[in-house]
A protein has these predicted regions:
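Conserved Rossmann-fold NAD(P)-dependent oxidoreductase catalytic core, especially the SDR/UDP-sugar
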Residues: 1-14, 33
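Conserved catalytic Lys-bearing alpha helix of Rossmann-like short-chain dehydrogenase/reductases
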Residues: 14-22
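Conserved beta-loop-beta element that borders a ligand/cofactor-binding pocket
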Residues: 23-46
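Glycine/proline-rich active-site loop of Rossmann-fold NAD(P)-dependent oxidoreductases
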Residues: 42-55, 89-99, 122
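A conserved pocket-lining segment of Rossmann-fold NAD(P)-dependent short-chain dehydrogenase/reductase
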Residues: 56-77
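Glycine-rich Rossmann NAD(P)(H)-binding loop
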Residues: 68-72, 99-106, 116
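Terminal hydrophobic/aromatic helix or amphipathic segment near a protein terminus
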Residues: 108, 112-168
Length: 169
């Protein structure tokens, strides 16, 4: 609430609103569970993995001797773990309950080392912390790009700098 994320990011606002609506249906006869899921790894037949976007971003750094990325980190799950959480919540929920689900907590630096090993076989790619102001400047470029294509992003690219710099686990 202090960061006013719902005001800045339509995606976050919609998730909060969805939870509020879902909880209205909970009563003594029907439990309602909301799973608060972080980044999910795995594939879904017929769908492009979300992480393809990250790979495309990292390829922009190929000609540089290092990669710049925010200092923070995030929680992560596998598709299988999400399935297990769904079953557990469905079997156990009473009333209205939100479950924050996580298995792996990694800094962006730790995570990118794994990605580079998988992507290029590079075990020691240098990762440099991107200052928040640089990330915000890139966010302004992205805002202009979105506007030129008449795209409304769910996460404000300038405000994303506040989130990406935090260890969200």
């Amino acid at each position: 609430p202090d960061m006013k994320l719902c005001e800045k990011h339509p995606y976050i606002r919609s998730r909060v609103e969805q939870e509020e609506v879902a909880f209205k249906y909970a009563d003594d006869d029907m439990g309602v569970a909301v799973l608060e899921l972080p980044y999910i790894f795995g594939t879904q037949p017929g769908r492009r993995p979300v992480w393809v976007i990250l790979i495309e971003q990292l390829q922009r750094f190929k000609k540089m001797p290092f990669t710049m990325y925010p200092k923070g980190g995030t929680a992560m799950l596998t598709v299988r773990q999400v399935g297990e959480a769904i079953v557990g919540a469905a079997e156990q929920v009473k009333g209205a309950r939100a479950y924050g689900i996580s298995c792996y907590n990694l800094t962006w630096r730790e995570f990118l080392k794994i990605v580079y090993r998988a992507m290029d076989g590079i075990p020691d790619r240098k990762i440099v912390d991107c200052p928040k102001v640089f990330f915000q400047m890139f966010g302004h470029v992205m805002r202009k790009d979105y506007a030129s294509r008449n795209v409304e992003g769910g996460i404000d690219p300038v405000g994303l700098a506040d989130i990406m710099g935090m260890e969200l686990f």
